[in-house]
Every structure is written in C-alpha cells, then in structure tokens.
Amino acid sequence: MCCISKQIAETGSTSKVLIMTDVSRAQRAAFARGSFLLLLAVSCHAFAFNPAAPHAIFQGRHPVLRARSSRPAASLKLRMVSQEMVQGVVDASQAGLHLAFADQGSNLAGKFFQASLLPYLAFLYFLNNNGAKTPKLSGFGFGFLLLFVIATIPTGIISKTVYGVSLADVDWLHGSAEALLTVTNILIAVGFRDAMSSGTAEGERGTLKIVAIAIAALVAGAAAIGSPVLGFEAHTPFLAGLGDLPSNFFASMGAASEPANALSIPTWAIHFSSVFEWIFAMRLVWDYADASKDQTWKGLTWGMLPLHASGVAACTYHFFYNNPDLSFLVALQAGLTCLGNFTVAIAAARIALANGWKVPFFSSTEAASQQGDEKKQFLESKPPQESDTMLIAKLAGLTVTSAYLVKYGELFLSLPFQANAVAAIAMVATPPALLASFYLQKAAAAQEAA
C-alpha cells in the first residue's frame, strides 16, 4: 500500500509509447530480463541482508560503496550477471527509462515520486540507529520496501513498451509487483509482534527473510520471461486468475460485464492484504510504544496514516477500473505517499532524538556505540492476545471476502462505471478519517488514565 513508486507505472500518456518505434521487441525482452535480474542482484546485496544499509550510507560504510576495496566477493557476485542481461539494459534503457522518467517528470505524480525517495531514506536512517530499539525484522521489512520501489520501475516500463498501457492495466505484472508490498508489510508486522511477545527487539526470523527474498526472485523471474517466453498478454490474470468466477456468472442476476482491465481475485486480494496488514502494523507500533516505554513510537503510527491513505487511493482508482477521467487519484496517491514519507521520517527522527541520537561527525563514535549498547535492553514482554494461526486465518478470511465483494459486488452498481470525482474523494478520505478518530480516542483515553 505505501506505494512509493507505483504511480510511475499508473500514469502517463499512451501516445508517448507509440513514439518508441525504434525499440524492437527483442530489445524490450532483453531489457525486461536484464534490468530485473541486475536490479535484483544489486538490491539483495545492498538491502536484503542488511536492513541498516541506508544508515550505513550516511556513515560512509555502505557495503556496495566499499565493495571494490573491502568486499571483492560481493563485486564478483554482481559480475556474475550475464553479458546478455547487461547488454539488454544498455540497449533498451535509454529509450525505456527516458520514456518512464520524462513522462513522469511532466506531471504532478512524477514530481511527487521524485520527492518521495529521499525522505524515505532518511526514515530508514533514523529508524536503524542503535538506540531506537527498532525490531530487527521490522527494520528489514521497511528496507525491503525499497525492493518494491525498484521493481515498479522496470515493470512500469515493460507495461508501456510491450503492451502500450500502464502497469495498473497489466494484471499479471501489477499483482506480481504488489506482492512485494504485501511481503514488506508482513515483515514489519511480524517484527513488532515478535518483539513484544519475546521481550527483545533482536529477533531475526532468518527463514522468513529467505522466503521474502525468494518471492522477490520469483517476481523478477516472472517479469523477465512473462511476455517473451510465456506469452503473457496485457490482461493475463495474476496467478492464472486463481479464484476468479466465470465472466457471465452473475449475468442472469443483472450484473454488468467486467471491463478487460478489471483486477483479478488474486490482485484484489494482494491489495486488500496490504491495506489490512498496514493497519495492523500501525496498531502494533502504537502498542510498541508502551512495551518499550518510549511514547515517541506513537508518533510513527500517526506518520504512517498518510501512507494508509495512499493505499486507499490506489484501491479506489482500481474500483473505478482505472478510469482515465479519474487520473487525479494517481496524483493524489503519489502526493499522499510523498507526505507519508516525510511524516514517517519526522517520526523516526523524534524516536532517534529521544534515544540519544547525535548529529554525525559531531559526537564521539565510541560514546554513541556505548549508548546504543545500553539501549539494547529487554522490552516489557506482552504475550499476544491470539495465536499466529488464528491471526492468519482472520487476515486471510477478511482479505478473500473483501476481494470477492469488491470485484463482483461492484458489477451490480453503476458507480464504478462513472467518473464520479466526489464519490472517489469520499472513498479515499473515509477510511483514514475513521482510523484517525480511533487513535484520537485511544490517545484521549490514555491521557485520562494517566
């Protein structure tokens, strides 16, 4: 849901795609293979096994920056990417990347996208400082989001250059990229939940990390071979449309026919799971403030609210079948993402300051390290109210039910087939407003109890 770069794929003019007549299908296929596998290799090395990588950048210790002098093995791994893949990136990137970023630079969504990245890196930097007591798995999850950001750029380019449409209209690519966001939210939520149940923020869950990387590899592989090898079309459903009902299933009951770009059940399920997991993560962050005896963590819950609204904006756009007359929703989504990245960065900075963070180069490294070690104390253990199995069952049931209700329920309404801007804005504003009201009441109750 916190779609930092989803807008790069959901906006843009189809006419600009048609200008790219000099880019052959073979070049596009090579670009699809090369860009994804190269980006995946870099991303996994830089972030996947080191959630504090953005923090290391600010300290001049980033593993990629020092690979040539101190990590020759890491450099060798990157060189293992085949020459064909690299050449594919070189051949097609000038046309493809120019299209994506030139097109985005000319609209509001693109400007928001560009402005979103730096504050998110700042957020990761503050969140991963030694004294913040951020659960390690959650820190890994927030860093894993960058893999989703990277993935949406090539998938968006593939959507435009191969199919001539936006990523939102290419269901199999759309669902694949969105799956990385779902994985991100699961990592974040599980990290906070484990920390509170075990009483320590040091839990790693190495197996879960490996599964996350494996899913990222599957997404990369699918994007690389989906069109040139498997022959996937623009509207090929994600996961073969698992769970989709026949197109005329409700025709006798007066239901309208779905447009060709309607989301499949798996893609809708991925969207709803991301929304619900993010809401759950916000609640866990709020509770973590009490467990860690650090009330500044509650500010992060508030900082996450615009990112929740961004996810709702994306779902609203899909509810209206990505109607181009409602393209302002894409800009709104991008703006909310940009705002949310600033608010979580500010919240993380408050957490860091409350736990002894000092401006780099103006404080003793030894003192900062000693202070960080002192902060690695046990949290107040808080056993979960329900088992993992029950929680997963509830989330799965809510996700699948929501996917079916929206996908097939909207066929009985006229609203999704109209460009009703007022209704769209109301749909975007209502869930975040209700969530804000909920936390205002919790804050008021806590003040009264104190």
PLM segments and residue spans:
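N-terminal chloroplast transit peptides
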Residues: 1-80, 367-371, 377
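N-terminal plastid-targeting presequences
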Residues: 66-450
